[in-house]
Amino acid sequence: IFSMTKAESKVIDFIKKHILLFLLVAVTIIAIFLRICGMDFQSDDFNSFLNSWWSIIKLNDFTGLATQVGNYNIPYQVIIYLMTLLPLNALYAYKIVSIIFDFVLAISTAMLVYSFAKNNRRLKAILTYSAVLLSATVIFNSSFWAQCDSIYTSFIILAILFLHKDKPIASFVFIGIAFAFKLQTIFIIPVL
């Protein structure tokens, strides 16, 4: 009974043609919004440890990294030192680092799925990106608890991706970086 105008038809065709891009943008916006919701939450870990470690790293400057501060490895402490140079409070700085790596993790995992998929590669990659970014554990870990697990996990995924692409040197560089950030990486090494 109703017929579309030429303009409406063009809009519908445009949406159909770019639906995956719209999905990607929508998921990214939702993921950012969900992370903003957790930015002001102060976990017990932050109040008991991370905040005081920030103060020590900031006070001692770069040379202070010669001594162990807290129980994180030096690569993470270097990142935190660099964040102390920015006009940010400790809570936001820790969370921003982790949130950035949430996106690195989502992108690298999507790339891994894309490289393995035989059909519907773009759709599967975008769904993977979405699943990682909208996972409650990933959201809470970074934006609520200020934890850094997405950092070493991103490098593990990149190691697997490059191994799959038959680039063993790059793979082992990424697994080495992951190991430098967190010793739990040892559990993935037998798989490689």
Outline where the language-model segments fall.
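Multi-pass, polyprenyl lipid-linked donor-dependent membrane glycosyltransferases
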Residues: 97-100, 130-134, 138-157, 181, ...
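Short hydrophobic alpha-helices at membrane interfaces in multi-pass membrane enzymes
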Residues: 124-125, 162-177
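Perimembrane helix-loop-helix junctions
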Residues: 4-6, 188-192
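Specific aromatic-rich, kink-prone transmembrane helix
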Residues: 108-111, 151-168
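Transmembrane-helix motifs of polytopic, lipid-linked glycan transferases
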Residues: 96-119
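Transmembrane and membrane-interface helices of multi-pass
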Residues: 113-117, 125-138, 160
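Transmembrane signal-anchor helices characteristic of membrane glycosylation enzymes that use polyprenol
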Residues: 14-49, 99-102, 130, 134-140
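Extracytoplasmic catalytic/substrate-binding loops of multi-pass membrane glycan-assembly enzymes
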Residues: 38-53, 67-79, 92
